[in-house]
UniProtKB/Swiss-Prot annotation:
The family this protein is said to belong to: Belongs to the 'GDXG' lipolytic enzyme family.
Keyword field: Hydrolase, Serine esterase
Function: Carboxylesterase acting on esters with varying acyl chain length.
Enzyme class label: hydrolase
Tissue spec. comment: Expressed in flowers.
Active site: S171, D272, H302
Protein's UniProt keywords contain Acyltransferase: no
InterPro entries: AB_hydrolase_3 (IPR013094), AB_hydrolase_fold (IPR029058), Carboxylest/Gibb_receptor (IPR050466)
Designated name of the protein: Probable carboxylesterase 9
Locus of motif Involved in the stabilization of the negatively charged intermediate by the formation of the oxyanion hole: 86-88
Length: 324
């Protein structure tokens, strides 16, 4: 390499991680974390509490409810449930990060819903399908709360409408949400009813480069080499990006189940590295006969709602329209 050549791109440096000899990673940036607030002071958007749902794995959920609960005829109105899978870049930050806590608080308050945010385990310490397992544990736990008349979680038993449950995920969380929706079809969730799924900027991949990946190869938020590294650290050891966890389009047994999904909302932006794969995902759903609402905006990029408050409001409005 000549002295004038630019240095090779280091995806691990971009992600601010170091891979350890035992396969774990050191995350050099510690994302600010927020403790739950079950009894918030006046002016806060939502109350929140943490509940461990699997003592063997340590997986927990954080439940959010609006501070001001609506009422009907002097009784508290029942609120829809959103099972929320946060975007973490697979490997970077947990559900109790300040960004996700703020997102879920706003969702609970603005949409008047109960949010159950899943604190799934992170790769590479826990590779896929651990995250899918954790999400299913959370869904089955929510179902159990309504059938357990003695020990059910009070916020769910007292405030939730179990006939209106939605699965919602962002980025890799939308990937988890898709697999959770498919897995839910193998279980009797009665009396819990899944009324729809929201996939926000779903993260999928594959070995063959798409036009949007080539166009946005050096994207400052999601450069393709960094996304490749995320998949490398998240997928089961020994598989490539055409594995069904990353690239669901070619997996025929899964396609039959896709047609049994309820209505879906898919949201994306033109500047997203994953745009083409998101649109292919919409085509997969449509071809299977799923009722799909696709909302793509040419202007925008991955995680734009974190830096543009107007886009955050627009996102909430799209979800509100879908669940109302």
């Amino acid at each position: 390499m000549s002295r004038d050549s630019p240095p090779a791109f280091d995806p691990y440096k971009h992600l601010n991680i170091t891979i350890n000899p035992n396969g774990s990673c050191t995350r050099h940036f510690v994302w600010p974390r927020v403790e739950p607030d079950p009894d918030p002071c006046p002016g806060k958007l939502a109350a929140s509490k943490d509940v461990t749902i699997n003592h063997e794995t340590g997986v927990s959920v954080r439940i959010f409810r609006p501070t001001n609960l609506p009422s009907n005829d002097n009784a508290v109105a029942r609120l829809p449930i959103i099972i929320h899978l946060h975007g973490s870049g697979w490997i970077l930050y947990p559900a109790n990060s300040a960004a996700n806590d703020r997102c879920c608080s706003q969702m609970a308050s603005e949409l008047t819903v109960i949010v159950v945010s899943v604190h799934y385990r992170l790769p590479p310490e826990h590779r896929l399908p651990a995250q899918y397992d954790d999400a299913l544990d959370a869904l089955l736990w929510v179902k159990q709360q309504v059938v357990d008349s003695t020990n059910g979680e009070p916020w769910l038993k007292d405030y939730a409408d179990f006939s209106r449950c939605y699965i919602c995920g962002s980025s890799n969380g939308a990937n988890i949400a898709f697999q959770l929706a498919l897995r839910s079809l193998d279980h009797d969730l009665t009396p819990l009813q899944i009324d729809g799924c929201v996939f926000y900027q779903p993260l999928f991949g594959g070995k063959t480069r798409t036009k949007s990946e080539l166009k946005n190869f050096a994207d400052p938020v999601m450069p393709v080499p960094a996304v490749d590294a995320m998949w490398e650290l998240s997928l089961p050891v020994g598989v490539d990006r055409d594995h069904r966890y990353c690239n669901p389009l070619g997996y025929l047994p899964q396609k039959e189940k896709v047609g049994r999904l309820g209505r879906c909302l898919v949201i994306g932006y033109g500047g997203d590295t994953s745009l083409d794969r998101q649109q292919d995902f919409v085509n997969l759903l449509v071809a299977a006969g799923v009722r799909v609402e696709a909302r793509f905006d040419d202007a925008g990029f991955h995680s734009i709602e974190l830096v543009d408050p107007r886009r955050a409001v627009a996102l909430l409005n799209m979800i509100r329209d879908f669940i109302s």
